[in-house]
């Protein structure tokens, strides 16, 4: 679109790109990704997807999670509370209608997970990659006889969940601070939930095998992930003109699977049900986060500056988050939410 990747990044970090121009620049990158991902025949599309899946099976279990934690997840809790909804859900929310607020959409998403994962009172539940614990706390409050365990590799997240559970006087919550790829246990769980976490895995076959060892014959595994309806891709730069992908996520951190790719990983589990959620739900989520950030921008700066040390560092973080939200809207609203979307699959142990 005329400017080099370096020029665009230079202008972006100086605050010289208005939102409307930024939307066009990002949309151009998604146009290019679509052109790259779709093949001229179904035979070539299938071969392309199978090559990608074969490549995943030859990799280590996960991507560069530590790098991503530092850059994306270890922001002050007060900042996260200012930007996200009441449960600090940093994944797709579910908007039941045009008037749904972000708080209502967070709750509706948790409700949908419980319905599709067939959560019932009295079960043991493990939430892998549990974030700030919104789903853990939702289940623990709603199903008083469930014992809910959250697993996170962020100490800040683990501390936050423990504090919230204490505040809510919940005695049926545990938090495990661990990297899931290195963690192991002899325990089994009635339900295992993996919400927008499998994107950080590479060798999904190894990951699913590990999860299956924590399941009994009656256990169910519910996986929710960002997807494209047709093709797989790493969230990495296509070429030197792609300034956007590497700015949003460090290389090697995020893989976006197609909506059917997990069906190729049934060595240790078997799919029972399969759903997709239109991408506009994610588009509306990131748009709500951006609006909340813009509305509380001065307070957000004050929260961030002590930890980051300078106004320049604060500006960089805010630019990154706003670009993530604007880019996410362009991605998930593409073709009215019928390109990138959320896929959900329910598995049982084989």
Swiss-Prot record:
Functional pathway: Alkaloid biosynthesis
Temperature dependence: Optimum temperature is 40 degrees Celsius.
Gene3D superfamilies assigned: Vaccinia Virus protein VP39
Record's GO cellular component terms: cytoplasm
Record localization: Cytoplasm
List of residues binding S-adenosyl-L-methionine: 91, 129, 153, 157, 179-180, 195
Catalysed reaction equations from the record: (S)-stylopine + S-adenosyl-L-methionine = (S)-cis-N-methylstylopine + S-adenosyl-L-homocysteine; (S)-tetrahydropalmatine + S-adenosyl-L-methionine = (S)-cis-N-methyltetrahydropalmatine + S-adenosyl-L-homocysteine; (S)-canadine + S-adenosyl-L-methionine = (S)-cis-N-methylcanadine + S-adenosyl-L-homocysteine; (S)-scoulerine + S-adenosyl-L-methionine = (S)-cis-N-methylscoulerine + S-adenosyl-L-homocysteine
Induction: Up-regulated 2 hours after elicitor treatment.
Keyword set includes Cytoplasm: yes
EC number: 2.1.1.122
Keywords, comma-separated and alphabetical: Cytoplasm, Methyltransferase, S-adenosyl-L-methionine, Transferase
pH-activity note: Optimum pH is 8.
Active site: 325
GO biological process, one term: methylation
Disulphide-bridged cysteine pairs: none
Keyword Metal-binding found: no
Described purpose of this protein according to its UniProt entry: N-methyltransferase with a broad substrate range, accepting protoberberine alkaloids (R,S)-stylopine, (R,S)-nandinine and (R,S)-tetrahydropalmatine, and to a lesser extent (R,S)-canadine, (R,S)-tetrahydrogroenlandicine (cheilanthifoline) and (S)-scoulerine.
Quaternary structure annotation from Swiss-Prot or TrEMBL: Homodimer.
Record family assignment: Belongs to the CFA/CMAS family.
Name under which the protein is recorded: (S)-tetrahydroprotoberberine N-methyltransferase
Species in which this protein is naturally found: Eschscholzia californica (California poppy)
Upper lineage: Eukaryota, Viridiplantae, Streptophyta, Embryophyta, Tracheophyta
